[in-house]
Amino acid sequence: MHFIDEVKIYIKGGNGGNGCVSFHREKFIDRGGPDGGDGGRGGSVIFRSNHHLNTLVNYRYKQHFTAENGENGKDSNRSGKSGKSLVLDVPIGTQIFSEDGNILFYDFTVDDQSFEIIKGGSGGLGNSHFKSSVNQAPRKRTEGEIAEEMWIHLSLKLLSDVGLVGLPNAGKSTFLSVVTAAKPKIADYPFTTLVPNLGVVYVDDEEFVIADIPGLIEGAHQGHGLGDKFLKHIERCNVLIHLIDGSSNDVVADYNTVRLELESYSDYLKNKIETICLNKCDVLTDEEIQEKINKLQKVTNKEVFPISTCTNAGVNKIVKLALETIKNQE
């Protein structure tokens, strides 16, 4: 399954049906009055959030969507049938923007939300509406309303409580696999994670959602590497878990690289609560661990937690701390 989180599509409401020109015809009634019915209303275009979806791949290849037109009016004052509305399902976390991205029309944050973005066109009036004392046999009717059409931009931001950040190969995917049932691709080389991965963490009969975002590199906010494409997915989370590769020769530089990218991308990310973890401590001596923690704490003025996703050392503490932070923000 391809992970698609940005698409542009064309949508159009259904046109209203035309009104009918008709006159009553019945045996022994030579000149019946007007009995043209109204046209049916066109179908609307409606978006609906669906928790079964997690990508916009359904809109990658088909990009034009039109609701059904209303039927024309009929004789005997029969109205045309209304057109069926077009319901388009999207994942929770989808945002609907104008084509240029400057106007946010709607933001889906829970399951089964609906948003009518285009109303169907009104049906035209049949000639029976235009009968008057001076015109007993009107041939006037109105045409159905032409429905609105537009190009829109759909953008998916994954909904998670916790976002995992760090340089490539910091151990984020391993962390996710240890604390959840998610099975991300894991290998000992950069950019193993090519798409965001989500997992559910269960702690003491409670749960939260955690997202593993592809590794950041210097210049990610400018489009370098993979990070720029996926940074938006952690804008909604409550807390960031920042993993640093303890085997790195310069853990402070690694930390600063990621922080710069977060701060350059948006104020939302800049101000997120951050839990800093020194990972891969299983390959370090106690003295090396303490030395690197001291360096990080001097720069960050925050507590730094030593962990190992290989031995699970310290991981459970981080998970419980994340849950506590989430609950304190609710």
Curated annotation (Swiss-Prot):
Its EC number is 3.6.5.-. SUPFAM superfamilies: Obg GTP-binding protein N-terminal domain, P-loop containing nucleoside triphosphate hydrolases. Keywords: Cytoplasm, GTP-binding, Hydrolase, Magnesium, Metal-binding, Nucleotide-binding. Its cofactor is Mg(2+). Residues 1-159 form the Obg domain. It is found in: Cytoplasm. One of its GO terms (molecular function) is GTPase activity. InterPro entries: G_OBG, GTP-bd, GTP-bd_Obg/CgtA, GTP1-OBG_CS, GTP1_OBG_dom, GTP1_OBG_dom_sf, OBG_GTPase, P-loop_NTPase. It comes from the Bacteria. GTP binds at residues 166-173, 191-195, 212-215, 279-282, 308-310. Mg(2+) binds at residues 173, 193. Residues 160-327 form the OBG-type G domain. GO terms for cellular component: cytoplasm. PROSITE patterns: G_OBG (PS51710), GTP1_OBG (PS00905), OBG (PS51883). One of its GO terms (biological process) is ribosome biogenesis. Belongs to the TRAFAC class OBG-HflX-like GTPase superfamily. OBG GTPase family. An essential GTPase which binds GTP, GDP and possibly (p)ppGpp with moderate affinity, with high nucleotide exchange rates and a fairly low GTP hydrolysis rate. Plays a role in control of the cell cycle, stress response, ribosome biogenesis and in those bacteria that undergo differentiation, in morphogenesis control. HAMAP family: GTPase_Obg. Monomer. This is GTPase Obg. It comes from Rickettsia rickettsii (strain Sheila Smith). The gene is obg.
